[in-house]
Amino acid sequence: MTYKVFIDGRHGTTGLKIDERLAGRDEIEILTIPEDKRKDPAVKAEYINAADVVFLCLPDAASKESVSLLAAGNTRTRFLDASTAHRTHPDWVYGLPELNAGQRERIRNAQKVAVPGCHASGFIMLMHPLVSAGIVPADYPASTYSITGYSGGGKEMIASYEEAGALGDNMKSPRFYALGLSHKHLPEMQAMTGLAHKPLFTPIVGNFAQGMVVAVPLLPRLLSRPVAAADLQQFFAQYYAGQTCVQVMPADPAPVLENGFLPATACNDTNRAEIFAFGHADQILVAARFDNLGKGASGAAIQCMNIMLGLDETTGLAV
């Protein structure tokens, strides 16, 4: 069977990656809207309603507008929205199959799936299991930071790193951003973990194209019961047992580090996320490493599409 796919916003960073990852798949037919008609609502509506699957790779307002073009009674066309517009909307299913035991089936049956944000993906993979198991109290004063490649900033940021000639020292240095502490991923980070309060989140962009690590520090004395890093490693290993796209790394950090370092790029060009637990009796650091353009964006979207179409969820994806 051939499925018709329309990528609305095909020329953005995520749209291009989805297009690239779907290229050559015999069961997928990409519907291509003429360049001069991309912003014509009437023409776009024709493509949306002709498709089996629509990927929305657009700003929030444009995503909402595209969803509104679905014809009344059309229950066949299914949406995967890569924007932040619908991630906490009750009528949309959150597109993280590994979230809990029932999430994959919810995605399979959904007409509208919201693809998680990249930073949020890592934070939720770490904190949702811990909060739902009662290890981390819901009112825990959570904080998190992430370092990501500049491709996560879209075309303008990519150009600032790749087309500006020789970079100055400020651009070579890792740079904190979203210092107003109101990053757009925060609502889903709270909603999908069960935390009573938004975490204090400090993202960092680095002078490398893609790859990321999201880290969450934990103080055992503030947790619901005493745990060590090895306990959390075992907990994660059990929680994510059987998950193809999430791998829990060994408790002994030496074999999984590079001379003591944890590089952000080791999962690039895959749809794999790696979970780590480091620390000692008084302090723990849990971390998730993955490709911000893979499990953090286009790979996650395609994984969900595969599930929705009843295909092997890793079809077309490297893990």
What is each PLM-predicted segment?
Residues M1-Y177, C267, F278-H280, T315:
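N-terminal Rossmann-like NAD(P) cofactor-binding subdomain of oxidoreductases
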Residues L31, L200-T202, M249:
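General small-molecule cofactor/ligand-binding pocket signal
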Residues P217-V319:
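C-terminal active-site/capping subdomain that shapes the small-molecule cofactor and substrate pocket
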Residues G9, T13, C118-M125, G180-P187, ...:
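Conserved active-site and cofactor/substrate-binding residues in soluble primary-metabolism enzymes
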Residues Y177-L181, I204-N207, P263-C267:
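Short Gly/Pro-enriched turn/cap motifs at secondary-structure boundaries
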Residues S182-A209, V213-A215:
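Oxyanion-binding "anion nests"
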Residues A23, E27, S132-V136, A191-L195, ...:
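Generic secondary-structure signature for well-ordered alpha-helical cores
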Residues K17, E65, M125, P129, ...:
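Alpha-helical scaffold segments in soluble metabolic enzymes
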